């Protein structure tokens, strides 16, 4: 195996060397072609001379001989002519001491050989030109010099190591005069050897000189000449004959080939030896690794078996302990269940007795109500007929009025033009008079202001003294009241803290969720206020147009299924278009929330049924973007504290205006002073708060009511939640994304928390809106019906129920009483008229 591998490696190396040699030959051929093309472009002034030969000579009429030169033949061989007497041969002596010294040295050298300057042919005058006529010879020499100024280069050959190639040879004449004599033995030739690196620099400079201007060419040529002259002085000069130069080149090439073959053989041997060593080392290493692997595998198997036995023992002990605990817990739970069943039976018996009493009283009231209903229906029919007649009359009157108004408008326009001219003249006159009066009034005002300032200072001093006395008295009274309230609150199920009264029910989480939502909502508003100043014009225009579309869509929501589907698709599209940046998405969601809450004051307070289509649109959009529901609840809790629920209590040294502001009363200014009063009355405030609560109840009802999502991809994954309150719940019918604060459990928690608080003037209004919207759903649902019944029983208790009957709330209290009586008779509350639209 070792022998075959070494043979293969040697063969591959030989093939690589052969390929490299072929590549070098191809490169040399390409260089030859490039050099030929470059020199032909220079108008054939420079001829590329490789080792060349002389062709058959021709005789001219004047007795001269023309000799043509061809490539691949030495220019230094015999010159033949037709004159037999004048033919000469140059005897070359190879026994020259200079050649031996030249071969021993590795330094740079210079061989001078005279060259005949000519084009494609050279004219020699053999035996005719007299030696004494020197003037004619000089004239001919000058003419030839003018035509043949440029140098001729030899074709490239393979470079031997340490020796320059013939590509870098340039041939020049040794002397100024090119007189051709009969004897060629005394001729000398200049062969200048250039380094290959210098030749490349010259070629690169020539390519750059064609692109640059003439001025730069002249400067570079002068610099190159100076450098060449300096380097040529340092080189050694040797005088050689033509045959000796060829002999040197051939000999150097042979030595180069011998050296290369030796190096290749040595490297092949080294590679074979290394290959054998590496192979033996790898085999030994593989054997060691296998032994180690088997030993480790056996150890691991033993450890695993031991650990498995220990785990089985521990698990059996834990099972026994768990069984004992389970049996003890079962016995305790059975005893508790028996006690609860007894208590439930006692409560059911009490309620049945109360129901029988109510049924007898309600039967008589039903008869009276039926009579009233029949009378009321007759009146309605009569009123409808009257309204139809009035509408027809009004239409006719409108048409007549419109015609009259058009005539009057034309007359008024003409009058207005006249009056406008008269007014302009009067205004000019009045302005002049007013300016004079104003100057007089300013003087009088300045005097009055000085007097008033003095009086105000005296009044302020008196008021400050009175306020200090009143504050001290109020503080003492508040401390006494707080002590009494804290004692009473501990007996009841609520607590007072930081001007807020909220429930102490441990199962309720509404107040904690309210705090978390308010924090996250404040963070979003800060983010929008910070980024608002950094927006570009395009972003501002997009936000403005998007808010317009949202306002139009929410204003056009009506109680029809087509309108609801259309508006939900528009709102979803507006959020999808704003997903370019986080700022735009949050701003669109906030604009939807603001506009939907503004509908409470404009529509829902006067017409509660309009809350259901709006709630359905918001729930459908919230299924795809749950962060909208979270923002809606946070802003709704800020507007109306009773949706949490909690009551507002006075703080220390707090004015009545700030208390009413925290309760939710509307003021003319955002910043409230101590003496400011709310714009609305107490009845208007109660109606507006009930509008917010009706929207909250409608959101719960529509989130629990089954419906088909209007969006094209309801099952697709929604966007990332801003607050993290959204949870995906799988129903039996379909999977939909529901917020955990909009379901039956949250509504029962709200009702428990409100019952645990001490009733106020507004509590009867809150119960009425809650039962009219959600009473039917909670009473019919199997899971919530029993718990709902228990909570209603707590409301009916005398201590709680009678406290709601306060002066000014008789209407809402009687309405609540009627609703509860109907519930105990029928077992359900009536459904709201606007639910099924």
Curated annotation (Swiss-Prot):
A GO CC term assigned to this protein in UniProt: cytoplasm
Species lineage: Eukaryota, Amoebozoa, Evosea, Eumycetozoa, Dictyostelia
Organism: Dictyostelium discoideum
Acidic residues: bias regions: 171-188
GO biological process terms, semicolon-separated: poly(A)+ mRNA export from nucleus; protein transport
Biased composition (Low complexity): 7-46, 134-145, 198-212
PANTHER family: GLE-1-RELATED (PTHR12960), MRNA EXPORT FACTOR GLE1 (PTHR12960:SF0)
Name the UniProt record assigns to this protein: mRNA export factor GLE1
Coiled-coil regions, chain positions: 525-571
